[in-house]
Curated annotation (Swiss-Prot):
Family from the record: Belongs to the peptidase A8 family.
Transmembrane regions listed in the UniProt entry: 10-30, 54-74, 80-100, 118-138
Name of the protein this chain belongs to: Lipoprotein signal peptidase
Main location, first listed in the record: membrane
GO biological process: proteolysis
Membrane topology: Multi-pass membrane protein
Organism: Wolinella succinogenes (strain ATCC 29543 / DSM 1740 / CCUG 13145 / JCM 31913 / LMG 7466 / NCTC 11488 / FDC 602W) (Vibrio succinogenes)
Summary of the function given for this chain in its UniProt record: This protein specifically catalyzes the removal of signal peptides from prolipoproteins.
Pfam families: Peptidase_A8
Catalytic activity line of the entry: Release of signal peptides from bacterial membrane prolipoproteins. Hydrolyzes -Xaa-Yaa-Zaa-|-(S,diacylglyceryl)Cys-, in which Xaa is hydrophobic (preferably Leu), and Yaa (Ala or Ser) and Zaa (Gly or Ala) have small, neutral side chains
Length: 146
């Protein structure tokens, strides 16, 4: 349990710090353009594809409550945490980083804009890490030998 907790905290800090450092660069004015991809600043007031933007200021508290619920569950079921600390650490770090954006900037700082062939939603490193965490969790659940 202690090793999992130590690794989890380290990974949490790493993912959180990388995401916030990239966002600081973007907020500082860094931009980049190409035919397929642009790095540009956008504030997402909703969640994926700007859904639930109508919740405005309440969304950050709802998300904070959801992450708090996950933490309470993990405190209750420590074996689940030990089995899945890797994706959980990534998920929580990315989630808390995006929630911090909502408190500080009024919306999530997004910056990666894919526009080759079709226009895709703008996203950030934390969003990618959430996808990675879900993929890892699914792999551990369905394919990892027990």
């Amino acid at each position: 349990m202690r090793i999992a907790l130590f690794r989890s905290l380290g990974l949490f800090v790493l993912v959180f710090a990388i995401d916030q450092a990239i966002k600081a660069l973007i907020l500082g004015g860094f931009r980049w353009e190409s035919e397929a991809l642009s790095i540009t600043l956008a504030f997402n007031k909703g969640v994926a594809f700007s859904m639930f933007a109508f919740l405005e200021g309440w969304l950050k508290y709802i998300q904070l409550g959801m992450l708090g619920g996950i933490l309470l569950f993990l405190a209750y079921d420590r074996s689940f945490f030990v089995a899945h600390y890797l994706p959980l650490s990534i998920l929580l770090a990315a989630g808390f980083s995006n929630i911090l954006d909502r408190f500080i900037h009024g919306g999530v700082v997004d910056y990666v804009y894919w526009h080759y062939g079709f226009e895709f939603a703008i996203f950030n490193f934390a969003d990618v890490m959430i996808d990675v965490a879900v993929a890892l969790f699914l792999w551990q659940t369905f394919f990892k030998q027990k």
